[in-house]
A protein has these predicted regions:
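Disordered, acidic Ser/Thr/Pro-rich linker "stalks" and the adjacent N-terminal cap
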Residues: 1-52, 141-172
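Short, solvent-exposed aromatic-acidic interface loops
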Residues: 65, 92-93, 150-151
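Short, charged/polar surface micro-motifs in flexible loops or helix N-caps
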Residues: 54-55, 78
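Extracellular carbohydrate recognition and processing domains
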Residues: 83-103
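Short, surface-exposed beta-strand/strand-loop-strand elements in extracellular ectodomains
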Residues: 67-85
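Structural alpha-beta junctions
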Residues: 137-139
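Acidic/polar N-terminal loop/beta-strand segments that form early-domain functional surfaces
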Residues: 19, 52, 63-65, 75
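Hydrophobic/aromatic beta-strand segments within beta-rich folds
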Residues: 32, 46-51, 57-62, 100-135
């Protein structure tokens, strides 16, 4: 399985809400731990990742610093529009350590992923790296279709999530 969170796989950041030449958004997908994108204050902040075609998502992992609340959304569209929420998570602050959060969606497809940083533990947050494992497909999977035999992959109907809980959407 290819890591779709890397520019080497054909993925790229096509939109970011802030830009600092020293910490550009492209650092999110360069695969290096010594580079990162720094959001330049005020919330929400966001970036949109274009995948190299339609993929079934098996795992999405993101490494951040100072992020408090994050929303992960996807779209099957050929353009970065009409995003649907996958999960919302409140992250614990870890002074001097990166936060690593992993989502294991079941039967979800995406052409684009949008990561919205809704709030932070400090005025500035950073996104260091992401890893996205998935399989190429030609058939989009609708968010309205229930997963086959498994629970947990539905649109989030409310934003309240328990602190420290898994990065998995609740059953609607």
């Amino acid at each position: 399985m290819t890591d779709l969170g890397l520019s080497a796989s054909g993925s790229n950041v096509v939109q970011a809400s802030s830009f600092d030449a020293r910490y550009p958004p492209k650092c999110i997908v360069d695969g290096r731990m010594d580079t990162f994108w720094m959001a330049t204050g005020l919330y929400p902040q966001q970036f949109v990742l274009k995948l190299p075609g339609l993929h079934i998502l098996d795992r999405v992992s993101i490494q951040t610093y100072n992020v408090k609340d994050i929303s992960i959304e996807r779209t099957n569209s050929s353009e970065p529009v009409k995003f649907e929420p996958i999960a919302i998570k409140t992250l614990q602050h870890q002074t001097g350590k990166l936060q690593t959060e992993t989502l294991s969606p079941q039967e979800l497809t995406a052409n684009y992923l949008r990561f919205r940083i809704l709030s932070g533990h400090a005025p500035f947050v950073s996104v260091h790296r992401m890893s996205i494992l998935g399989r190429e497909t030609r058939t989009p999977i609708s968010m309205d279709r229930p997963p086959s035999g498994e629970q947990g992959t539905r649109v989030i109907r409310n934003a309240a999530q328990p602190a420290g809980g898994p990065l998995v959407p609740p059953v609607a």
